[in-house]
Amino acid sequence: MKLADLAHLLGAECHGKPDSEITGVAGIEEAGPGHVTFVANPKYAGLARKTKAGAVLVAPSFPEIEAPTLRIKNPYLAFARAIEIFYPAPSYPSGIHPTAAIDPTARIGEGASIGAYVVVGENCVIGDHATILPHVVIYPNVQVGDYFFAHAHAVVREACRLGDHVILQNGVVVGSDGYGFAKDDAGKWHKIVQSGPAIIEDYVEIQANSCIDRASVGETRIGRGAKIDNLVQVGHGSSVGENTLLCAQVGLAGSTHIGDDAVLAGQVGVAGHCHISDRVIVTAQSGVGGNIEAGKIISGSPAYDNRQWLRVCAIMPRLPELLKQFERKRKTANE
């Protein structure tokens, strides 16, 4: 593909060598003459000046470099679109594989693709153009929307509802039983029936081996456009707001409520019944034990204001020496 044609597809402004051939994408340090790459952060301008790439996606204000540039407001998003251009997703033929077990009461939408050994239970509704890959199991009374995509070995439990353009990666379980038990007078634990479904709204993606538990009563809900990374646990009766990000190994205890546009970085843990408001950022490995106001950035365990936490981190390596100084001064004062 000529660079000028790629620029047109991306809506970018081409600077230099419009007739050069672009054959793929690569990171800025690995890119060669046939690759397009990107720089979204000005601090990497040095790498852009050294790159051997055939073209670099940059912001309009980015300084001139030797390599040809494609100038666009959001270089990172444009790079993502370039990947789609050069490496289109595989397509799957519509129809039902002969080994799939589809209950006669299930309704399968137009253009849906049902792979080998898929199980679809009674009274399920599968949306138009859904793609369900081998060994996916969908329990009875489930509804999934149009363009739903489930990778191999995903499971959707009974009565859950998933919207349009939802993606489940391999090994995801939606609607597994919440962790609920009641102790009797003899000290024995009794399972609490988890009666409420998990609801997954439109354009949610849940990545590999994550679990969204069903609720004991009520529902567990993942809001429109939320993105959930690998190995995430969402406890029963919790809610996750629209466009919120839960990074790898986040754990939400039951009845946790996360607002819109929040970010919980890797290995964040949240205690039950906490409310984390809109636009909150919780940095990696933090432990949240209380409610968090909108727009806050918090860190640590227990989590508190990020700026204060950074100051504490800066002091920590000096504590042994500060303690020695304190002990010397106290000894001097007592003499």
Language-model features: where?
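Structural signal for interior beta-strand "rungs" in well-ordered beta-sheet cores
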Residues: F38, G95-D305
